[in-house]
A protein has these predicted regions:
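Tryptophan-paired
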Residues: 3-72, 110, 133, 137, ...
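Extracellular beta-sheet/turn segments enriched in Thr/Pro/Gly and aliphatic residues
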Residues: 76-129, 137-139, 268-272
Length: 272
């Protein structure tokens, strides 16, 4: 739904020296150090003096193996499927690596760390979604449009990457279906039934009202897709795209427009 805030179901805290993981803390709602503790501020003991940096990630999908030791590079190389990010509650959370700073009495004021003492180390880490979310409220004609009616057959994500890693970069080859009309249908490529609502939606909804409009079948919901950046290319054929497949396009009387027969496509790109 619109306006939904991502929340954490698990958090993973790594203390390291930039190369090696020196201490790992897992936080859920039931662990000794809970998510609520980390949210409001808490003391973590036995952090090695050699630790200089803290890294936090969260909402790691079930079945994904995270290291509890080893190298930071191995942690950042952990790969995730974009289809695992289909719901707000599933969105992976991450933040920038933050340095551990030494606290001197009274400077700065740390209301979230009442037990901190002179010489202790602290870090403030902000985390947010590791992927971008594209929401579609609906598709409608304008008053000046020559369109008098249409059916939205489906919405398809194109020019996307299947995987990303905890370093925030894409992995593998970009998935591109190009200008082949038959590619945009359930059962083609990665547009499988299991990926419905993740990489595409296909519902054949007829436009109604004046102006003609199509909205998601469930009130208060939006068509939404999680994506990862696919580069800063200015080439329209390389940018992330949403492809809208329309049928039954009808022109207003007297418009002199002929849409022809068969499906028609609208491609939206230029996402920032």
């Amino acid at each position: 739904a619109s306006g939904t805030v991502a929340t954490a179901s698990n958090l993973h805290v790594y203390f390291h020296d930039g190369t090696s993981i020196l201490k790992y803390v897992n936080a859920t709602t039931t662990t000794p150090i809970t998510i609520a503790n980390l949210t409001t501020g808490t003391q973590i003991t036995d952090v090695p003096a050699a630790a200089t940096t803290v890294t936090v990630c969260g909402n790691i999908p079930a079945g994904t193996s995270l290291p509890t030791g080893g190298t930071v590079a191995a942690l950042k190389a952990v790969q995730l499927e974009i289809t695992s990010q289909s719901a707000v509650a599933d969105v992976v959370l991450s933040g920038d690596d933050k340095p551990l700073q030494t606290w001197t009495t009274g400077s700065p004021a740390l209301p979230y760390a009442p037990g901190i003492t002179d010489g202790d180390k602290y870090a403030e880490v902000e985390i947010g979604p590791a992927v971008a979310r594209v929401e579609i409220e609906g598709l409608a004609t304008t008053a000046s449009s020559a369109v008098d009616g249409f059916t939205l057959e489906g919405i398809y994500v194109n020019n996307f990457f299947e995987k990303f890693n905890l370093a925030g970069t894409v992995v593998g080859t970009k998935v591109q279906y190009g200008a082949t009309p038959a590619a945009y249908a359930q059962g083609q490529g990665l547009y499988t039934p299991a990926n419905a609502g993740k990489l595409f939606d296909q519902s054949a909804v007829a436009a109604t009202g004046i102006p003609k409009e199509v909205i998601p079948p469930t009130a208060g919901q939006r068509w939404a897709y999680q994506v990862v950046p696919n580069g800063n290319s200015t080439d329209a054929n390389e940018q992330l795209q949403l492809v809208f497949k329309l049928s039954n396009l009808a022109a207003k009387a007297g418009s002199s427009v002929n849409f022809g027969t068969g499906d028609q496509f609208i491609t939206v790109r230029g996402f920032k």
